Amino acid sequence: MAVLEVKNLTKKFGKFTAVDNISFELKEGEILGLLGPNGPGKTTTIDILLGLTKPTTGEIKIFDLPFEENREKILKQMNFSAAYVNLPWRLKVWENLYTFGRLYEVEDYKEKIEILIKEFQLFDLRNKLTDSLSSGQLTRLYLCKAFVNNPRLLLLDEPTAFLDPDISDLVRKYILNKVKTEKTSVLFTSHNMAEVTEICDRVIFLNKGKIVAEDTPVGLTKRIKFCKVRLFFDLNLGKAELLLKNYKYNFSSVEKEILVDIEEEKVGQLLGRLSLAKLKYSQITIEKPTLEHFFLEVIRNKNEN
């Protein structure tokens, strides 16, 4: 079942189009990555879904209800976390969370919040003023707020920004557990492609306000046919470079190392040619494509067009 349906969504600011006729859906218990370069597309889309700005054209249905006509009912079952959230700075951590617990009409919100601040390692900071928190501590506070009402739909904009690796891992595991146990649906943005690959079921790429690719992280990675072969030569570096030039390989070299950009299926052919020429390498590493390579390729191609 689709929890979120977006059809032909467009948002213009004067002559500038921030979101350009995009359509997608998010299913129950699914994590959908919304990715793209820095720019207004992702944030504007999230702002529209939160009712913070109105679309120029397009339709949004959440929980099978038209969003505009059912905003209050829908928003009580949603929540979000983002680095640009502004909380009352002069309130203490627990005061901020209690405010949101009451706002969302959460039963037993005090007990719920105590569990959350322990989960996100904020318990010892509960009496600190919000404006005294570090960036990483604020991120954890935003996440506590996001989960306080057990939302059916969660919008997470860079949820692990400013977090140490161990806390980032804790956050990802918590999100995955929520999805598994409560069928929470998550729209997830991040610039950490390894994180996206780990956590997202599907990914949408936005560039200049348009959807330019949509697939699973693995499916998108498979679209990149090239890999990088790193070869180290103690001897005969010059002869190896000459062979690669003669066969018109795309490569670069520095000191004893040669880096070859090559189609993955042709790696065996390359190694065979080196062997026939009796050019022995002391070490080899093969860097297979990742989602980050796909991200860079998409942006490069679109910027050239």
Where are these regions (language model features)?
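Conserved ABC ATPase "signature" region
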Residues: 98, 102, 108-125
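Conserved catalytic motifs of ABC-family nucleotide-binding domains
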Residues: 150
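ABC transporter nucleotide-binding domain
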Residues: 173-261
